[in-house]
Amino acid sequence: MENIEKLLMQEKILMLELDLVKAKISLARANGSSQQGELSLHRETPEKEEAVHSALATFTPTQVKAIPEQTAPGKESTNPLMASILPKDMNSVQTEIRLKRPSDFLRPYQGISIPQKSELNSTVTLHGVESGIQHPHINYYVVYNGPHAGIYDDWGCTKAATNGVPGVAQKKFATITEARAAADAYTTSQQTDRLNFIPKGEAQLKPKSFAKALTSPSKQKAHWLTLGTKRPSSDPAPKEISFAPEITMDDFLYLYDLGRKFDGEGDDTMFTTDNEKISLFNFRKNADPQMVREAYAAGLIKTIYPSNNLQEIKYLPKKVKDAVKRFRTNCIKNTEKDIFLKIRSTIPVWTIQGLLHKPRQVIEIGVSKKVVPTESKAMESKIQIEDLTELAVKTGEQFIQSLLRLNDKKKIFVNMVEHDTLVYSKNIKDTVSEDQRAIETFQQRVISGNLLGFHCPAICHFIERTVEKEGGTYKCHHCDKGKAIIQDASTDSGPKDGPPPTRSIVEKEDVPTTSSKQVD
């Protein structure tokens, strides 16, 4: 990789030297023509001198009169009423056949243009970036194998090309040169055809299923009025979509495996926080907005460090974006300071019919200091479809703990509250009663055994233990109903050779399937 960069640098330097040599050649030619013009001037000078001497020879002393005495102070000058014949007033007699025009003496180069100085700066040519100007950062993705192998410049196309393909390998690069070098090295080692560069608009990737095609938003064509209305110079901004395509289990498993296998090489826009069962994404500046949106929908984000223009979160829900904008403009004095979004979320839950539960989020906004990314490690991914419920229970317990910790914070400002999302920030003043009621209402609506979209006895047991430590009480209608059924079944006069069918079912559901150990 370093040899390629050195060769490219040498190529640019040689091109600059070639331009310099061309400029020297043009200047040498121009100097040669100027010397010829000077020789022609020297040839004409004796003729002028002869004409001047002949005019002086015809002068007689009687024709010269003295200048009148000046009565006013000042420099003496010739009388404008007296005719004066001086050498400068004599017209030169030209004996050559070709007439010399004054313009010929003013243009010694005879129409040869002087080479202009090159305006290119060596620093700009070599580096390609002007100081003080920020250019949009474009990442490149190499899909090494599979039916859609190639080099992409869009994360969405890359995900569509690799999602659901077994054994596919892909990697992210910061420049097209690095991506091309890696792709060529792979194809050379595998003795396969060279991978093509596939821009965003030319990627022909069909939806994976008919259901995905139905849920994908169609492109709307702009209809312009042609009678008396002038067409605007630019297309109108896209309207806010009231719904987004639901995340599928395949999408979640793809992002889950991507986070587990990410080792931090080749991408400085994100890093992962790795635990025993799950890896969460931490997105930095210039991260792919589409990937941020998908990871947000999957509940796999821990922190976001957006740019000043908030381009990384432009695809998040509109109310969340508006809350972040209001925080930047109203809650901090220096609007140019970096901020962070710390997210605690559950993960989706699916059934045979489809998506059952969308993630719930508690988001904290604050002013960010220097970001020190943790080292991303490639972790082993052994999760199966049947393990997703257990993982959802663990993330649900962690979500409840984070939500209950808000009771210990006395200075909180609620930026936004929705049915499944709470956005808050720290405040210099004590929490007002309105914000306190909003937090309590959100806690009462979310903290229950139905947190994951279905009644989970393990969640109920965790809530009960947590609330008892705080000195409170918690009761679940479903769990109390199950206990009543168990008690009634124990007093039933049924057969004594075995438990009733309802007893075994209820006891199996009532046993917690996970521990209360916190998973960061």
Swiss-Prot record:
BP GO annotations: regulation of translation
Comp. bias regions, Basic and acidic residues: 40-51
Pfam families in UniProt: Cauli_VI (PF01693)
Location of region: Disordered: 32-51, 487-520
Primary site of residence: host cell
Subcellular location: Host cytoplasm
Gene Ontology CC terms: host cell cytoplasm
Record-linked InterPro entries: Ribosomal_bL9/RNase_H1_N, RNase_H1_N, RNase_H1_N_sf
Keywords from the UniProt entry: Host cytoplasm, Translation regulation
Entry similarity comment: Belongs to the caulimoviridae viroplasmin family.
Additional information: The inclusion bodies are the site of viral DNA synthesis, virion assembly and accumulation in the infected cell.
Function of the protein: Enhances the ribosomal termination-reinitiation event leading to the translation of major open reading frames on the polycistronic viral RNAs.
Stated name of the protein: Transactivator/viroplasmin protein
Organism this protein belongs to: Cauliflower mosaic virus (strain D4)
